Swiss-Prot record:
EC class: transferase
One GO BP: diaminopimelate biosynthetic process
Annotated SUPFAM superfamilies: Trimeric LpxA-like enzymes
Pathway entry: Amino-acid biosynthesis; L-lysine biosynthesis via DAP pathway; LL-2,6-diaminopimelate from (S)-tetrahydrodipicolinate (acetylase route): step 1/3
Similarity field: Belongs to the transferase hexapeptide repeat family. DapH subfamily.
Lineage of source species: Bacteria, Bacillati, Bacillota, Bacilli, Bacillales
Molecular function terms, GO-annotated: tetrahydrodipicolinate N-acetyltransferase activity
Pfam families xrefs: DapH_N, Hexapep, Hexapep_2
InterPro entries assigned to the protein according to its UniProt record, in alphabetical order: DapH, DapH_N, Hexapep, Hexapep_transf_CS, Trans_hexapeptide_repeat, Trimer_LpxA-like_sf
Catalysed transformations (reactions): (S)-2,3,4,5-tetrahydrodipicolinate + acetyl-CoA + H2O = L-2-acetamido-6-oxoheptanedioate + CoA
Known EC number: 2.3.1.89
Native source organism of the sequence: Shouchella clausii (strain KSM-K16) (Alkalihalobacillus clausii)
Biological role stated in the UniProt entry: Catalyzes the transfer of an acetyl group from acetyl-CoA to tetrahydrodipicolinate.
Protein name in UniProt: 2,3,4,5-tetrahydropyridine-2,6-dicarboxylate N-acetyltransferase
Source species, domain of life: Bacteria
Amino acid sequence: MKMMDANEIIEFISKSEKKTPVKVYIKGQLDNLSFGEGVQSFINGNTGVVFGEWSEIEAVLNENAALIEDTVVENDRRYSAIPLLDLKGVEARIEPGAIIRDQVEIGKGAVIMMGASINIGAVIGEGTMIDMNAVLGGRATVGKNCHVGAGAVLAGVIEPPSASPVIIEDGVVIGANAVILEGVRVGAGAVVAAGAIVTEDVPANTVVAGTPARVIKEIDEKTKGKTEIKLELRRLNEDQ
């Protein structure tokens, strides 16, 4: 897995065309309406749906107002610089309501739950679960077979570009509503307790808790039993 450099992300955002895509349901005398090459139109008789940039569609609607009986416009962004990730080729389980931006890497067998937000440049390893409403900021990197609990936040680092991103090594379990601040590395096999605020690196195979988080013990068999990663939850259809 390759992490994007902060300057690469900044350049990507800077040079991207800022878009306001819309979906418009339209009713009226539509036979001779032309929305141009940049707009997809699906018109049948006096009703139809068009997809495209709002400025282009709005111009056609205004020019042909006398022919149009009614419209409904669906719009969820304005001058957006980063599209959402095309999920069709991702070999992972991604549930409805997850927001995943372009230029995110997701490993095979990962699980992204409802409401998770994953920003540009983030990397998610094979078999890792990102639970409900968790947030992975820009360039946050999570290794293989981890669990990032519901509502947890891995701080993002794009600006300033010199700052170090959050790195979560393999086999880490992060409890619900924990916060991992910029530049922190969590060592392999570690456990971050629910609600912890992690401001410093976490040694491998330790448990940290509190605000700010401190090491409270080494990983033992009891802890392993409580934080076991279940591979059954990560199987895709072809793995069954």
